Amino acid sequence: MADDDPYGTGQMFHLNTALTHSIFNAELYSPEIPLSTDGPYLQILEQPKQRGFRFRYVCEGPSHGGLPGASSEKNKKSYPQVKICNYVGPAKVIVQLVTNGKNIHLHAHSLVGKHCEDGVCTVTAGPKDMVVGFANLGILHVTKKKVFETLEARMTEACIRGYNPGLLVHSDLAYLQAEGGGDRQLTDREKEIIRQAAVQQTKEMDLSVVRLMFTAFLPDSTGSFTRRLEPVVSDAIYDSKAPNASNLKIVRMDRTAGCVTGGEEIYLLCDKVQKDDIQIRFYEEEENGGVWEGFGDFSPTDVHRQFAIVFKTPKYKDVNITKPASVFVQLRRKSDLETSEPKPFLYYPEIKDKEEVQRKRQKLMPNFSDSFGGGSGAGAGGGGMFGSGGGGGSTGSPGPGYGYSNYGFPPYGGITFHPGVTKSNAGVTHGTINTKFKNGPKDCAKSDDEESLTLPEKETEGEGPSLPMACTKTEPIALASTMEDKEQDMGFQDNLFLEKALQLARRHANALFDYAVTGDVKMLLAVQRHLTAVQDENGDSVLHLAIIHLHAQLVRDLLEVTSGLISDDIINMRNDLYQTPLHLAVITKQEDVVEDLLRVGADLSLLDRWGNSVLHLAAKEGHDRILSILLKSRKAAPLIDHPNGEGLNAIHIAVMSNSLPCLLLLVAAGAEVNAQEQKSGRTALHLAVEYDNISLAGCLLLEGDAHVDSTTYDGTTPLHIAAGRGSTRLAALLKAAGADPLVENFEPLYDLDDSWEKAGEDEGVVPGTTPLDMAANWQVFDILNGKPYEPVFTSDDILPQGDMKQLTEDTRLQLCKLLEIPDPDKNWATLAQKLGLGILNNAFRLSPAPSKTLMDNYEVSGGTIKELMEALQQMGYTEAIEVIQAAFRTPATTASSPVTTAQVHCLPLSSSSTRQHIDELRDSDSVCDSGVETSFRKLSFTESLTGDSPLLSLNKMPHGYGQEGPIEGKI
């Protein structure tokens, strides 16, 4: 807006086209390149320093040192200089402050210092030295309240003295030239032009930047300085305390690496920036000379007090990299593309298996034949002492996840059985028993005999052996002093150990026979159920592994054989990632296993290493059916609003995962819709707006009765975010739901300088920022001011048309009458759920004829008669189906037989490509399957509710808060 010429054709005053030179082109005044002319001209020898100089207020006194030159250094000061070329003699040089826009105008700030008066510096040059320096120039900052007053006086003075009025005030005043007396009287017309120009330029003036305009006047024949040379304009000078004038600098980031998929939150501290004029740029210079760049995602509400930015990383150009990629990150100002010094940033490959489920599945599976190769290791399938599969005796190389060397189990492969010992009278031969722990720790190797004493002396039928705990020994038991005692003791313990081994072998043999008879694997598991508490190198128990490898029946068998004994210990056992079996069942999407675990008492309240409960995990993955199972548990209620380690509730994660079904389940289960996440106080509605998800935002407002003006810790409402991001759809939705565009957050609207308070100017409390102040475009600004939302349609946006128009008005009336019955299984609300429009049920209830409103919505969204028939069939509503069938019966059909459902399905319907397009639109972000976007695009509530009622009220604020916001026919 500031770059447009406010005085062009069509304005109050017409441009004087007789002017032959382009007085409005700032590029005309090349600062340092000499003009191609034979006569006198003015040239800038040294530019002023652009940054680092502070504009001072009246109360602060003069500047400490004048405006330095561009080449000024600490020990070598320099100042702006100009030279009058091709001329020697007396001259007068004036310096005026002008704006930095495309069109040059007078600036309201004033030059102060030696030779300065009324904001203008006047210096004489010559007659010999035609170089003029300005060693003590200062810039006086005018307050906002006095901009118009000061600017009008400055313009009047320029017109009276003839100091470039046609250029700096208005083109219609170009005829006013410098006069010797300087006491010209202005006409009323000239004063009006000045006033209008001052009004317009006051609105557009940037108080943080100025330029110096140098104009030289040579004497005429009378000695008066009236011969004006073409002025020259310096580079821009930025106020050092203005946000857009400071040097950009990254001070600190809490992370310097992120995943290639982007979307990770980073906190960045920086020097002063302007929240609506800053970008965070990621870039990489490629080998072929190209440059990849991406920009951090944040809105003005994510910039805190001009010194901190919270943003999300962009996606890297290649998300399939196999090794880290180094890029750079820097701040960049939008207005002038000024950048900060780049900092390194590392993109690492995507970790697709964060829960390590796939890694564990990829382990080498145990091979059955490995158990018969060496003869020294324990056999598979129960052939060894503890029936460890996976090739797994302690003397062999245990298979991953199956050999538990840390327990130091001794091998018993040398034992054979004779008839008379087992049920089958198979004999036993006492072979050599090696009782040394070859795979155990050093301390355990010496204590194998002592450990055998820990076995129970007598086991009852059906109980397994106690687990050896050799590794807990810290010191070997003192042995007898004589060799004879030691040999006797060793012999006794060998005999005792052999006896226990035989008892254990007998039990396993019995279990094997029972399995052969019944075919029930639980017969084998029962004798080893005490070992289900053993964990592998990852901390996983057999129950963890069975779930990871999707063996649902094995999980059920394990739960059955351990029921009532050690069930609680293994059901809620955590692995090294703090995952319980229930966590893994949710992660691997096994609904039946989740139900089995809950039935035997799995604890929902246990959290994983990130503080996630099973509700968080189900919502994150969008498993609505599993989430439904979990929410049915009585123990789920206290966890619904429990935050995880990131401070997020399950409802927040459902929104961030774009899962409408999970969100609906949580709302129905009583989740606190207005709960704040613990980092910045955002509610689920804030997050839906932040993710530009109109579907979820509509669900929260319509189904969850979300507080539309809920605030974060810094007072930001969802409307602030929508306005700052320029989202017209969400701004319209929130405004229609009653959002207040005048709510102020805690971010100051402007930076109040301390000196203003000292000067008594602009005193008082600095106002906060409202959504109106943050409107990123005119469309949002108009919506916030009450203008109806009018979306711009493209060919891709046009909704596909269904065939509902084939139903006659009489048929529609009969259907609506049938759908108004109170039976919950056959009324309009149930049909709406079947048709995917259930989220609008609350809105439908506000209508005098909900069933008619439903049918109108369904037609607008491209619904077909086929889908309507299928929905009615699912409801079992034969009367409604017959009404539709009757509408398509021909006389011949009526005389012969009624039309079948299959025949109705053969009626003219929309093409398959059209239906596919409908499904794509419903699944996309732009058109939600909830029907909210459909309502925004096509639905006129004026037509669908009563036919003439203009408003549908959607009051989604707490009772007694604010005012109701109506949704009009067009938003």
UniProtKB/Swiss-Prot annotation:
List of residues that carry Phosphothreonine: T946
Organism: Mus musculus
Intervals of motif Nuclear localization signal: 358-363
SUPFAM superfamilies recorded: Ankyrin repeat, DEATH domain, E set domains, p53-like transcription factors
Primary role: NF-kappa-B is a pleiotropic transcription factor present in almost all cell types and is the endpoint of a series of signal transduction events that are initiated by a vast array of stimuli related to many biological processes such as inflammation, immunity, differentiation, cell growth, tumorigenesis and apoptosis. NF-kappa-B is a homo- or heterodimeric complex formed by the Rel-like domain-containing proteins RELA/p65, RELB, NFKB1/p105, NFKB1/p50, REL and NFKB2/p52 and the heterodimeric p65-p50 complex appears to be most abundant one.
Modified residues (S-nitrosocysteine): C59
Induction (record text): By phorbol ester and TNF-alpha.
Region ranges (Essential for interaction with HIF1AN): 646-680
Lipid-substituted positions (S-(15-deoxy-Delta12,14-prostaglandin J2-9-yl)cysteine): C59
Cited PANTHER family: NUCLEAR FACTOR NF-KAPPA-B P105 SUBUNIT (PTHR24169:SF9), NUCLEAR FACTOR NF-KAPPA-B PROTEIN (PTHR24169)
Assembly mode: Component of the NF-kappa-B p65-p50 complex. Homodimer; component of the NF-kappa-B p50-p50 complex. Component of the NF-kappa-B p105-p50 complex. Component of the NF-kappa-B p50-c-Rel complex. Component of a complex consisting of the NF-kappa-B p50-p50 homodimer and BCL3. Also interacts with MAP3K8. NF-kappa-B p50 subunit interacts with NCOA3 coactivator, which may coactivate NF-kappa-B dependent expression via its histone acetyltransferase activity. Interacts with TSC22D3; this interaction prevents nuclear translocation and DNA-binding. Interacts with SPAG9 and UNC5CL.
Domain Death intervals: 801-888
ANK repeat ranges, renumbered to this chain: 538-567, 577-606, 610-639, 646-675, 680-710, 714-743, 767-797
PTM per Swiss-Prot/TrEMBL: Generation of the NF-kappa-B p50 (Nuclear factor NF-kappa-B p50 subunit) transcription factor takes place both cotranslationally and post-translationally via non-mutually exclusive mechanisms. A cotranslational processing allows the production of both p50 and p105 (Nuclear factor NF-kappa-B p105 subunit) from a single NFKB1 mRNA. While translation occurs, the particular unfolded structure after the GRR repeat region acts as a substrate for the proteasome, promoting degradation of the C-terminus. S-nitrosylation of Cys-59 affects DNA binding.
Positions carrying (3S)-3-hydroxyasparagine: N674
Phosphoserine PTM sites in chain numbering: S335, S447, S755, S896, S910, S926, S930, S935, S940
Protein name per UniProt: Nuclear factor NF-kappa-B p105 subunit
Record's keyword annotation contains Ligase: no
